[in-house]
Amino acid sequence: MYKLICKDGNAKRGEFTTVHGKIQTPVFMNVGTAAAIKGAVSTMDLQEIGTQVELSNTYHLHVRPGDEVVKKLGGLHKFMVWDKPILTDSGGFQVFSLAGLRKIKEEGVYFNSHIDGKKIFMGPEESMRIQSNLASTIAMAFDECPPHPATREYMEDSVARTTRWLLRCKNEMNRLNTLEDTINKHQMLFGINQGGTYTDIRVEHAKRISELDLDGYALGGLAVGESHSEMYRIIEETVPYLPEAKPTYLMGVGTPANILEAVERGVDFFDCVYPARNGRHGHAYTNHGKMNLLNAKYELDDRPIEEGCGCPVCKNYSRGYIRHLLKAKEMLGLRFLVTHNLYFYNKMMEEIREAIENQNFASYKKKKLEGFAAEQGN
């Protein structure tokens, strides 16, 4: 259940109660595709850096180790030793990104595994069953992820199919939550709004799915090639047609600046691979933009990544040492950067929540964006 605590303009400060605890929103979910954060960051580390929600991938876990294996081992929470909320995506994005390897039918999608080429079928019911086996806190509906750009005709057909699939997801989720051997009988379902950059299609779809009284709603199919200004326009024009009394989730977005802009437009939930991916490439997020620790100027630098940062890495290690680890191709260097970056995102969300409560989000956002723009020679 979602409780709106307060608003500052369109920015919402809320609390989402789940069977695995309360989520303070706006929130950034830390992406652990195969039930682990890439970069050797454990769930113990996630607890220490203030992670509220972990996100795992249905498609990847279905292919390996298999959702039945995870179920036999007690579900994702027990499997990865994490007692806070977990959101699983539906697998749709991954399936539809296998463009040459898949075939869309009304019942679902036929595709080949990226691991061994084995033929797999996934439709709304299959996605719900897999996510039920994983026993995540929040399951995402199985939707078609249309290509960008797409013709209006294609988009209308695709969105209509996504709506039909959503109804099937809801019915199957309701059924699964009543079964005796279901691990999480309180699994929640979020629907996904699609429509590309066609505002009228997005708005009509938002109105339609809002009638279904789901636990939350996501904006899908963004950050797939459209400009940032187009993405912000779509968020601004679509969010008012989604229920304010439910959380809104912007899937796969994004940079710290993207998050600030989306919060201002009423978004509650975010996820993105950037903090971990950039960390694995030697980049650290700071309040003054991204820093490339591979840069030679940090060789003799005994300062932390960011002065005043409360993460366990900045409290203990220097830029010079981290640079050495990266140059020596030591896994520890990547782990340090991923840990710092996730902490940076989690801390920023904490500051955003505080700014909304104090009714000064606009000035907080302005100051933050000015800091990011000051990135020079990092």
Curated annotation (Swiss-Prot):
The gene is tgt. Homodimer. Within each dimer, one monomer is responsible for RNA recognition and catalysis, while the other monomer binds to the replacement base PreQ1. Its EC number is 2.4.2.29. Residues 252-258, 276-280 are annotated as: RNA binding. Substrate binds at residues 89-93, 143, 194, 221. It catalyses: 7-aminomethyl-7-carbaguanine + guanosine(34) in tRNA = 7-aminomethyl-7-carbaguanosine(34) in tRNA + guanine. This is Queuine tRNA-ribosyltransferase. HAMAP family: Q_tRNA_Tgt. One of its GO terms (cellular component) is cytosol. Catalyzes the base-exchange of a guanine (G) residue with the queuine precursor 7-aminomethyl-7-deazaguanine (PreQ1) at position 34 (anticodon wobble position) in tRNAs with GU(N) anticodons (tRNA-Asp, -Asn, -His and -Tyr). Catalysis occurs through a double-displacement mechanism. The nucleophile active site attacks the C1' of nucleotide 34 to detach the guanine base from the RNA, forming a covalent enzyme-RNA intermediate. The proton acceptor active site deprotonates the incoming PreQ1, allowing a nucleophilic attack on the C1' of the ribose to form the product. Zn(2+) binds at residues 309, 311, 314, 340. Pathway: tRNA modification; tRNA-queuosine biosynthesis. The active site is at 89 (proton acceptor), 271 (nucleophile). Belongs to the queuine tRNA-ribosyltransferase family. It comes from Lachnoclostridium phytofermentans (strain ATCC 700394 / DSM 18823 / ISDg) (Clostridium phytofermentans). Keywords: Glycosyltransferase, Metal-binding, Queuosine biosynthesis, Transferase, tRNA processing, Zinc. The keyword Plastid does not apply. Coiled coil: none annotated. One of its GO terms (biological process) is tRNA-guanine transglycosylation. It comes from the Bacteria.
